[in-house]
């Protein structure tokens, strides 16, 4: 495993914060070894008998080639019942293959595979499906697209072009359907091939999304599935000639398109005098919301939360709001109230409470580089450091107003594996939880704040931070690093009901951890 050092400094502004007892239970699996060092959890599903079915991806390193998936069935105590290894092997005619995602239907598990077939000169998307009892995988073709229609070949499903990702795969919240979008070659018209399948692999939508604007003027944001599984919502950020003439605010508009079997319909909305660099669509039964950060200065500065609500059928705009960060949030970050906007925020995820309130999470992320001269002459080399700084979390009411917004100040950086830093977040009831690795001591700061310190991510204590419905904090150490044979990768947590699953790793040694709230 690549060696690296991560530096962490977390400070929280909390009224009367102290370590508290947060109800939880912990179960660990036995420590085990894989042939491959690098592995991560990609799917967790309850088996209906208090056990769990886990899918892990693996990849070889510098001296061990190979890639594939481990399928593992555990009982309620994380005792292994059954396991199966599926190694991805390609024929000579299959190139540039990639597993887009994994989906389950009862006891059937499917790997959604996309590969370039050199004989057919086409990209072919297939489902590799098996029962979890016998692991006899059967291939079913879902669709194919001629290579001549694809914008570029080498970036497929990986690199970013003109704001769009070549391929996008998403599974809806209920895990009953999945959507795939593919950027199609057409420099004069923004074009995406859009597919919707249910978890039984039935094709629900096969649609050509077109927008009469040059490709570089359209930025794909995201796609989501309606609650009934029959419609798709595609959000784009569009730079039109009309918006270019705006005197204030972002010189663009957002366009939300509803796609069905019958075709597509689009609603346009503006950020007025504000800037909103990116938005996320969230689908409810009776409404659509688009949520993100906004600024009064420019894109990718952040003053607060922007909120748009639309009708899910007509797409009529019901309301729009711009909520500045609360005074408590600013004190969290700076220790005092001040007029300053944030920067470098990266969206991390959305959580929905039982009351359909939105918990919107982000993280301050950026990269720095350093050039090192060779002491013996002959040039030098660059090193890159990836920073995972402040966590931002805000809870949004049904009317679009902010219930609370909190800032978790921290300083994390790594030049290698980022799995042990950052965080995983979940909710239970109306409480929001963050799982983080921290250092030995909790230090008190001014203005009733605290700070967690850490110097090495390989020696980490696992902590949970809880935000209650009124926005107050409490925290608790769950695992001391001295009691662990392996450190746990807190950025790769997988959620299932009221439990969070982590995998720990030290060399080839691994262990699964289940935390139930």
Segments predicted by a language model, with ranges:
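Beta-propeller blade signature
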Residues: 68-78, 124-136, 191-202, 248-264, ...
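Blade-loop segments of beta-propeller domains
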Residues: 32-35, 77-120, 142-159, 207-230, ...
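Structural signature of eukaryotic scaffold interfaces centered on beta-propeller domains
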Residues: 35-49, 98-110, 155-175, 221-230, ...
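Short, conserved, GDST-rich strand-edge loop motifs in beta-rich repeat architectures
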Residues: 53-65, 116-123, 176-188, 237-250, ...
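Long, internal scaffold/assembly segments composed of regular secondary structure
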Residues: 222-356, 362
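Bacterial Sec-dependent N-terminal signal peptides
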Residues: 1-25
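Conserved blade-ending motifs and adjacent loop-strand segments that build the rim/top face
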Residues: 90, 266-280, 317-342, 401-423, ...
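Loop/turn-rich, solvent-exposed surfaces of beta-rich toroidal or solenoidal domains
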Residues: 236-238, 292, 346-375, 382-384, ...
């Amino acid at each position: 495993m690549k060696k690296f050092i991560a530096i962490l400094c977390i400070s929280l502004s909390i009224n009367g914060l102290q370590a508290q007892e947060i109800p939880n239970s912990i179960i660990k699996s036995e420590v085990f070894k894989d042939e491959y060092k690098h592995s991560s959890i990609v799917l967790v599903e309850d088996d209906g008998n208090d056990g769990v079915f886990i899918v892990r991806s693996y990849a070889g390193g510098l001296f061990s080639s190979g890639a594939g998936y481990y399928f593992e069935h555990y009982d309620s105590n994380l005792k292994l019942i059954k396991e199966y290894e599926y190694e991805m092997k390609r024929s000579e005619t299959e190139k540039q293959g990639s597993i887009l995602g994994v989906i389950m239907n009862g006891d059937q598990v499917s790997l959604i595979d996309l590969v370039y077939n050199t004989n057919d000169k086409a990209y072919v998307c297939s489902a590799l499906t098996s029962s979890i009892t016998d692991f006899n995988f059967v291939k079913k073709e879902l669709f194919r697209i001629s290579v001549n229609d694809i914008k570029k070949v080498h970036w497929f499903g990986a690199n970013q072009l003109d704001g769009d990702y070549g391929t996008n795969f998403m599974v809806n919240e209920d895990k009953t359907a999945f959507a795939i979008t593919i950027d199609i070659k057409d420099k004069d018209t923004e074009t995406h091939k859009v597919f919707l399948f249910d978890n039984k692999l039935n094709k629900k939508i096969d649609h050509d999304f077109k927008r009469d604007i040059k490709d570089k003027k359209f930025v794909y944001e995201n796609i989501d599935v309606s609650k009934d599984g029959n419609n798709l919502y595609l959000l784009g950020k569009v730079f039109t000639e009309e918006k270019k003439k705006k005197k204030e605010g972002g010189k663009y508009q957002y366009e939300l398109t509803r796609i069905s079997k019958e075709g597509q319909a689009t609603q346009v909305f503006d950020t007025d005098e504000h800037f909103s660099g990116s938005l996320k669509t969230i689908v409810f039964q009776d409404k659509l919301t688009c949520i993100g950060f906004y600024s009064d200065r420019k894109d990718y500065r952040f003053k607060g939360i922007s909120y748009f609500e639309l009708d899910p059928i007509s797409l009529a705009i019901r309301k729009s709001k711009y909520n500045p960060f609360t005074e408590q949030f600013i004190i969290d970050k700076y220790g005092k109230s001040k007029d300053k906007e944030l920067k470098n925020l990266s969206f991390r995820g959305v959580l929905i409470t039982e009351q359909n309130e939105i918990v919107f999470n982000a993280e301050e992320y950026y990269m720095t580089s350093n050039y090192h001269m060779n002491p013996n002459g002959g040039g030098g080399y660059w090193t890159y450091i990836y920073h995972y700084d402040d966590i931002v979390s805000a809870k949004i009411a049904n009317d679009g107003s902010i219930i609370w917004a909190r800032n978790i100040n921290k300083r994390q950086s790594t030049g290698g594996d980022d799995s042990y830093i950052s965080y995983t977040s979940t909710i239970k009831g109306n409480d929001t939880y963050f799982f983080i690795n921290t250092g030995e001591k909790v230090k008190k700061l001014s203005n009733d704040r605290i700070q967690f310190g850490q110097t090495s991510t390989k020696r980490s204590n696992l902590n949970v931070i809880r935000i209650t419905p009124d926005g107050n904090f409490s925290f608790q150490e769950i695992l001391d690093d001295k009691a662990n044979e392996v450190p746990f990768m807190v950025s790769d947590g997988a959620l299932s009901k009221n439990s969070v699953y982590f995998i720990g790793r030290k060399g080839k040694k691994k262990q699964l951890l289940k935390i139930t709230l």
